[in-house]
Amino acid sequence: MFVLAIVFAFVFIPSSSSVTCDFKNELVSMNWNVKNNKIQIHFEHNNLTENRWTSIAFGDGPGMNNLESIIFSRREDNVITTNSGYTPKKKKVVVDDVSYVTVNDVQITGNKLKVTVSRPLGPAGPRNFSLDQCLNWMVVPGGSLSNGKFKKHHGKIFFIKDVCAAKCTAERIQRINSNKAL
């Protein structure tokens, strides 16, 4: 009976360590958390040069169709812009007339970009896109920017499978970090 109870606990009680609330590699790092039904995303890119863009995309993937995007770009004059948009078909990004993400902080030091944005966790923007369900996230490391237009990206896309952002609350992240320290 005792063994059955232990098996039940492991099978039916979700582990807090299985929640993905961050991503990091040699080029980009980001983490996200939810508070008061808003998601805040802190994103860093280690080599965003002038006239380049990078983005975070959300959707089924791994193909580039029907993805919702947050796009960060660096113009020739070092101005950083943040847009929201979507990809109705591969190789084409349609930028929203009004971005539905709020920029909380942005810094550029050399070629290192640090930006923190927030948006509603639930339906937002012209397509009522929601991040409250588990879905795939993709990081597009970059592409060129020409006359304000986003050109095709180059290089590998980083794929983060089944992100359940709604589970990334401060309390849960603290528990996960405490478990990692053990």
From Swiss-Prot:
InterPro entries tied to this protein: DOMON_domain (IPR005018)
Domain DOMON: 26-143
Keywords: Glycoprotein, Secreted, Signal
Covalent S-S links between cysteines: none
UniProt keyword Glycoprotein, yes or no: yes
A Gene Ontology cellular-component term: extracellular region
One Pfam match: DOMON
Residues of the signal peptide: 1-18
List of glycosylated residues: N47, N128
Localization terms from the record: Secreted
Superkingdom: Eukaryota
Protein name per its UniProtKB record: DOMON domain-containing protein Y73F4A.1
Organism: Caenorhabditis elegans
